[in-house]
């Protein structure tokens, strides 16, 4: 569930409310790089929230995936006094490297602000962690809805995957907790709101905006694929815009970690599905590459290339793969899209080649991969 900018006032879910400042607090807090496979990234996103070490009564029994800032306790005094100095050093090093227990969160740790958006299974609120004053979005999911639609396993997978991803163009999932009726996800606040809402406002994006977003998404997907993660639902509704105008891939509800095997699950959004998915032939990471081609087309035209009022016609259009390119699409953009929308998944352009494509090189913002230096206005605020 993504969230738009919503001006409605919220019904407080945890007591207290506040107004978001014009800028994110200039606060850099400690974090640990507990990435998948312990991979070190070059992400410039340094701000995170950290649980204070003080204890108190909570109504939650679950633990957060947010790395604590406390360090492990010093080596035990029960070590043998007869050990050699090298042995003592080794013991101390081993003890100090022990993992610190994860901290527990509850709703009382947050000031709850306005309602940002509503989805099928819950709501998203602006929130502020009381100790650090860090601004986040709090996604509140209702257990009865999750159980009714049998998607508890999907939520667990989403948490497991998204909480381990570290990339400036992937929305951070800092942690989670729950009570008797609700599950709370602590996620990064993307001030620009939904990409889809911006696309609706302006009809279509100019080439600089489209190329910049495409470059950022391609780089983020390349990172995901290096971790054997397939998103499986890339579309404007699942993209958010950060404070610097950068795109953020969100909603990993359909994502899967698939190191060695092809997938066969029919999932995602119909107009974005590649032929191998609808024909149930099995698919891999190249399914995301096809979806990127659909996305670029929609960025530039305002609709997907295979859209239809009839579901059966969408199936037919995807299988035929006969794309009509309006004259407004430049030759370079058409070339890139046509290289992505190839029916044979093995013949599609790679994400590395997308990043280095002439259309990207010509139109993408020079600071596209440096979000802290980007400063790109929202499409609806641009002067054309």
From Swiss-Prot:
EC category: transferase
Active-site positions on this chain: 233 (proton acceptor)
Alphabetized UniProt keyword annotations: ATP-binding, Cell cycle, Cell projection, Centromere, Chromosome, Cytoplasm, Cytoskeleton, Kinase, Nucleotide-binding, Serine/threonine-protein kinase, Transferase
Record bears the keyword Lipid metabolism: no
Annotated SUPFAM superfamilies: Protein kinase-like (PK-like)
Feature: compositional bias, Polar residues: 1-12, 19-29
Localisation per UniProt entry: Cytoplasm; Chromosome, Centromere; Cytoplasm, Cytoskeleton, Spindle pole; Cleavage furrow
Any one cellular-component term (Gene Ontology): spindle midzone
Annotated family: Belongs to the protein kinase superfamily. Ser/Thr protein kinase family. Aurora subfamily.
Residues at which ATP binds: 116-124, 139
Major localization listed first in the record, in broad terms: cytoplasm
Positions of the UniProt region annotated as Disordered: 1-100
InterPro entries referenced in this protein's UniProt entry, alphabetically: Aur-like, Kinase-like_dom_sf, Prot_kinase_dom, Protein_kinase_ATP_BS, Ser/Thr_kinase_AS
Name used for this protein in its record: Aurora kinase
Keyword DNA-binding set for record: no
Domain Protein kinase: 110-360
This enzyme's EC code(s): 2.7.11.1
GO biological process: centrosome localization; mitotic cell cycle; mitotic spindle organization; regulation of cytokinesis
Low complexity composition bias: residue spans: 30-99
Assembly description: Interacts with icpA. Forms a complex at the central spindle.
Catalytically driven reaction(s): L-seryl-[protein] + ATP = O-phospho-L-seryl-[protein] + ADP + H(+); L-threonyl-[protein] + ATP = O-phospho-L-threonyl-[protein] + ADP + H(+)
Primary role: Part of a chromosomal passenger complex.
Record-level Gene Ontology MF annotations: ATP binding; protein kinase activity; protein serine kinase activity; protein serine/threonine kinase activity
